[in-house]
């Protein structure tokens, strides 16, 4: 309900289930935001409705979105367009129409309040390249959708992702003193890629510093 239809009541329930109280969950949110480098974000509630001091920026939401797409199974929920609940008695429809209309789009989330206007963090993946776009302050849902569509088109038309390292690819070893083994390997917990312009046809070299 949270991922598909922006259910504010469900967001509160999830917060209370995970942290005991809304306040405790908000403290976790702010701590995680700080860890991710979201320097201009302060959360005051778990549902996102307008509240004094509850604020963020497009850049900070992009940082959060970049992390979100790496969370296991999250995109399985955000890409749902329609979902039945309570044995078919209720049907929720995703406010992010791009997951239905835009090729490769599988998230992430829309939002709207009287202060923020119509906002969206949208992501799409094609041919191994994934991009995230964030828009805030649109005047209508259609403007939000159309502008996000054009931004994603621009990304796919002008940029490409080049994978540098695979997940768990060993890039070096270090000696271990008095350990269970003589050496330990270094490897990324997720694939590592760089974004290049499509006009850049030059050779890419990787240098690993341990």
Feature locations, PLM:
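Active-site-adjacent loops and short helices of periplasmic peptidoglycan-processing enzymes
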Residues: 1-72
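Domain-terminus/edge residues, biased toward the C-terminal soluble/receptor-binding domains
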Residues: 38, 50-210
């Amino acid at each position: 309900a949270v991922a598909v239809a922006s259910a504010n009541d469900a967001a509160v329930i999830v917060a209370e289930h995970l942290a005991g109280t809304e306040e405790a969950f908000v403290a976790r949110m702010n701590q995680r935001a700080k860890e991710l480098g979201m320097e201009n974000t302060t959360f005051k509630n778990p549902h996102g409705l307008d509240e004094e001091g509850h604020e963020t920026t497009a850049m900070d939401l992009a940082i959060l979105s970049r992390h979100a797409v790496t969370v296991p199974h999250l995109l399985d929920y955000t890409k749902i367009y329609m979902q039945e609940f309570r044995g078919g008695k209720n049907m929720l429809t995703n406010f992010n129409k791009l997951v239905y209309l835009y090729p490769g789009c599988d998230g992430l989330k829309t939002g709207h309040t009287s202060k923020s206007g119509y906002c969206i963090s949208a992501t799409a993946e094609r041919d191994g390249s994934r991009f995230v776009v964030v828009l805030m302050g649109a005047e209508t849902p259609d403007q939000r959708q159309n502008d996000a569509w054009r931004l994603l088109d621009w990304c796919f038309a002008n940029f490409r992702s080049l994978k540098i390292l695979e997940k768990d690819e060993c890039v070096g070893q270090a000696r271990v003193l008095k350990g269970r083994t003589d050496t330990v390997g270094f490897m990324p917990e997720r694939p590592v890629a760089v974004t290049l312009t499509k006009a850049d046809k030059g050779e890419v070299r990787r240098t690993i510093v341990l």
